[in-house]
């Protein structure tokens, strides 16, 4: 009985220690999440404006033509896979990888992994990678996103692949994060976004609209990648906060059950001792 009580007490201390860790991780994630949300929200107007600029160029010029805005016939794809650097975030990374697997079924594709987990996943599955230079999502800067965009656009123009897709986790709310695989290039739908403009070619582009368009696309892609990185970081922190909150609650419930078990064992031990004392006294 005493040995059993000692084991329960050690288990309680172990669970309490784990609960302190999960609670601390929950608080850290909550603190970082607010800044990550603000950064993600600040990014959105930038690439929305860039997208509208591209639409205006494509729609406003009858002689418009760009390698970035037409199908090349090359069905090979490149997925920019944005995952986290660490685990302990529930199904955050696993759900993203399932999204990639569903999107890439029966396809010939390359991967540009961003984040430690994305690099590890790509290596483990033997995916061909454009580069593995961005293994820490926490260290990805705006300059890094421009570097990635220029690399991808260069390979796209050379015909290494005919499509570029972003595979990341969209931040919806504190309790909802949505893995998504969205096509980025070619921008073939721009000219389909007609809005009944009756006056065209009011803006003159030098040297011409197509060259301006081709110069803007890498910046647009860099903005999309950076926005997706910000959304992914916010999603990872939200998922980790939720997971650690659930772990803390589970630990509290377990401690309550263990304390109840310990108190019952202690009560039984005391009752047994009293019975033995009474029995001994009666024997005398």
What are these regions (language model features)?
Residues 1-284:
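C-terminal beta-strand-loop-alpha-helix "lid" module of Rossmann-like NAD(P)-dependent dehydrogenases
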């Amino acid at each position: 009985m005493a040995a059993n009580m000692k084991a329960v007490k050690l288990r309680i201390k172990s669970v309490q220690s784990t609960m302190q860790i999960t609670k601390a991780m929950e608080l850290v994630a909550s603190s970082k999440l607010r800044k990550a949300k603000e950064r993600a929200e600040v990014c959105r107007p930038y690439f929305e404006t860039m997208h509208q600029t591209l639409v205006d160029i494509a729609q406003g010029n009858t002689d418009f033509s760009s390698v970035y805005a037409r199908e090349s016939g090359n069905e090979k794809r490149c997925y920019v896979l944005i995952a986290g650097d660490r685990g302990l975030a529930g199904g955050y990374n696993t759900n993203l990888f399932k999204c990639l697997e569903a999107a890439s079924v029966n396809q010939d594709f390359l991967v540009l992994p961003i984040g430690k987990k994305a690099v590890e996943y790509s290596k483990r599955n033997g995916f061909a990678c454009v580069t593995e230079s961005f293994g820490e999502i926490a260290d990805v800067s705006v300059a890094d996103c421009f570097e990635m965009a220029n690399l991808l656009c260069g390979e796209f123009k050379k015909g290494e692949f005919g499509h570029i897709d972003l595979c990341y986790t969209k931040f919806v709310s504190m309790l909802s994060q949505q893995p998504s695989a969205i096509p980025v290039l070619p921008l073939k739908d721009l000219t389909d976004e007609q809005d009944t403009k009756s006056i065209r070619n009011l803006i003159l582009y030098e040297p011409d609209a197509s060259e301006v368009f081709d110069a803007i696309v890498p910046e647009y892609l860099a903005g999309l990648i950076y926005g997706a990185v910000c959304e992914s970081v916010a999603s990872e922190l939200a998922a980790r906060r939720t997971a650690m909150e659930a772990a803390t609650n589970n630990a509290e419930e377990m401690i309550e059950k263990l304390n109840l078990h310990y108190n019952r064992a202690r009560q039984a031990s005391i009752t047994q001792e009293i019975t033995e004392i009474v029995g001994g006294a009666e024997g005398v």
